[in-house]
């Protein structure tokens, strides 16, 4: 059973086996506490978040930088969401609204564009050892930020990465500009460093609480025991606890799935095997 929660109480609902945090915005300490303590109890957490907020409208798309509030907590565990977007020559297609000059008039139309922000992941880009992608040999990721991991205390598995011909965009120019780049509408990445970027990772091991040794200064106690005394903060998780991070949240949005299905046909995976 799937249950939605905003974690505003500072706790994850009882009997939760897997906590998925999708496209978080301006997380408060109580919400971070709920995520943190669920992980410390040995629960599996999946974070799907980017450094960019992508807006879709009927006639344009845009992206602006954002801070979701999850960044300090992830950084505590040695995981950073890069403040860029990954572009790749191994790409998918997107029915995108564009404007075309027709004589003295401007015409709005929709084109099926080769879209470098939709990264077409093939079997060689997907982890085939953990069992998470069992039976999956292709996946498209949308508007994804790269991940940087630096925590030798954890066992880190790359779930999927971009191709060796990918590069990073620091500007967020996700709307095509055919005046500037007539051939494709986008910067080709010429002169940029080309390399594979981590797009999703799975970290496992013992995690230390972000709240360890810190006062819990929000307006409710972390929890109350049967004798009425506050429950202590759990400061370390059991061994083998798992945290997965995906550098995009919008790829799960209904509007994006509908648009991409329209462009590429139904090519969406069933649930991942976490």
Ranges and model annotations:
Residues 1-274:
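Acidic, S/T/G-rich, low-cysteine, solvent-exposed domains in lumenal/extracellular/periplasmic regions
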């Amino acid at each position: 059973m799937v249950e939605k929660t905003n974690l505003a109480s500072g706790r994850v609902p009882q009997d939760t086996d897997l906590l998925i945090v999708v496209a978080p915005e301006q997380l408060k300490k109580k919400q971070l506490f709920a995520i943190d303590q669920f992980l410390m109890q040995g629960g599996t957490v999946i974070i799907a978040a980017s450094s960019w907020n992508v807006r879709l409208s009927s006639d344009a798309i845009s992206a602006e930088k954002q801070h979701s509030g999850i960044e300090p907590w992830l950084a505590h565990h040695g995981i950073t969401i890069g403040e860029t977007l990954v572009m790749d020559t191994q790409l998918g297609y997107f029915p995108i609204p564009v404007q075309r000059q027709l004589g003295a008039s401007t015409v709005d139309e929709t084109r099926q564009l080769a879209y470098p922000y939709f990264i077409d992941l093939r079997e060689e880009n997907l982890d085939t050892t953990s069992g998470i992608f069992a039976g999956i040999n292709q996946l498209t990721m949308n508007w994804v930020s790269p991940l940087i991991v630096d925590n030798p205390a954890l066992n880190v598995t790359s779930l999927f990465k971009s191709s060796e011909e990918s590069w990073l965009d620091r500007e967020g120019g996700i709307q095509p500009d055919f005046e500037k780049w007539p051939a494709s509408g986008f910067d080709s990445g010429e002169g940029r460093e080309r390399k594979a970027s981590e797009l999703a990772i799975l970290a496992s091991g013992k995690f230390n609480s972000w709240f360890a040794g810190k006062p819990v200064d929000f307006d409710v106690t972390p929890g109350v025991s049967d004798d009425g005394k506050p429950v202590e903060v759990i400061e370390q998780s059991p061994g083998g606890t798992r945290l997965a991070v995906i550098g995009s949240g919008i790829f799960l949005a209904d509007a994006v799935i509908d648009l991409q299905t329209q462009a590429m046909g139904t090519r969406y995976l069933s649930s991942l095997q976490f």
